[in-house]
């Protein structure tokens, strides 16, 4: 957990970056996005981008039940995972332990606790986890091949490109859980992405520290996130 929480982190990521909310990428023509940006970083669902032409990918989602306990210390840790069928939830989160330690915990006589439940994804829900089985693995490969046919690139492919001219024609980059159909935690995505831009920070003629902030936001996605830049 970042110092000060995720709100502070997100505010820092978007500092000096124009941000618009309540904008549906799919309600606008692609040419409209091209008018305001040379390239798009797209973190929406890869199958939705192509209008589900090969079929829909499967997801798992989660729901939370949050309550206040009249106790300064409910479970002694921020997160306790449960794998037994005896429990309907997969983990219990006690939020104060993320930033409070030692005797500080007992200064507040109450504590906030959340139970996390894993459920099957249905339309209208927020997709959280890709389903790693034969059907979905084969299906996402078809979408990735289609993306390549349209000149779309993925973050791992940039590792092997040391000159901007080698991918100068690319105008869309897919990244994140939904666009890559891969599970990522915060630490994993930062570890994966930062070296890509340190190898050659002139790839996009943009300071790589800006890309660090951009890709650090590739983690917990809402429906999707689209970043538009003039380069």
Annotate each PLM feature.
Residues 2-6, 33, 81-82, 182-189:
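Aromatic-acidic/polar surface patches that form glycan- and anion
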Residues 20-24, 95, 175:
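Conserved beta-strand termini and adjacent loop/short-helix elements that scaffold enzyme active sites
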Residues 26-146, 151-152, 159-162, 167:
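Mid-domain catalytic core of redox enzymes
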Residues 129-211:
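C-terminal catalytic lobe of FAD-dependent flavoproteins
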């Amino acid at each position: 957990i970042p110092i000060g929480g995720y709100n502070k982190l997100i505010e820092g990521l978007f500092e000096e970056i124009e941000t618009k909310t309540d904008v549906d990428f799919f309600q606008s023509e692609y040419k409209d996005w091209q008018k305001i940006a040379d390239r798009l970083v797209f973190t929406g669902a890869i199958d939705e981008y192509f209008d589900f032409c090969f079929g829909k990918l499967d997801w798992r989602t989660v729901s939370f039940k949050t309550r206040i306990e009249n106790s300064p210390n409910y479970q002694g840790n921020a997160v306790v995972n449960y794998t037994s069928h005896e429990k309907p939830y997969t983990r219990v989160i006690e939020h104060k332990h993320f930033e409070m330690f030692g005797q500080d915990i007992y200064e507040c006589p109450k504590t906030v606790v959340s139970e996390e439940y894993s459920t099957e994804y249905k339309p209208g829900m927020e997709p959280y986890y890709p389903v790693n089985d034969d059907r979905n693995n084969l299906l996402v490969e078809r979408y990735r091949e289609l993306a390549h046919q349209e000149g779309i690139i993925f973050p791992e492919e940039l590792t092997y490109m040391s000159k901007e001219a080698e991918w100068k024609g690319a105008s869309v980059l897919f990244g994140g859980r939904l666009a890559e159909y891969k599970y990522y935690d915060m630490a994993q995505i930062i570890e994966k992405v930062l070296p890509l831009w340190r190898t050659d920070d002139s790839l996009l003629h943009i300071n790589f520290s800006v890309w660090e902030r951009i890709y650090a936001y590739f983690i917990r996605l809402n429906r999707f996130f689209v970043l538009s830049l003039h380069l």
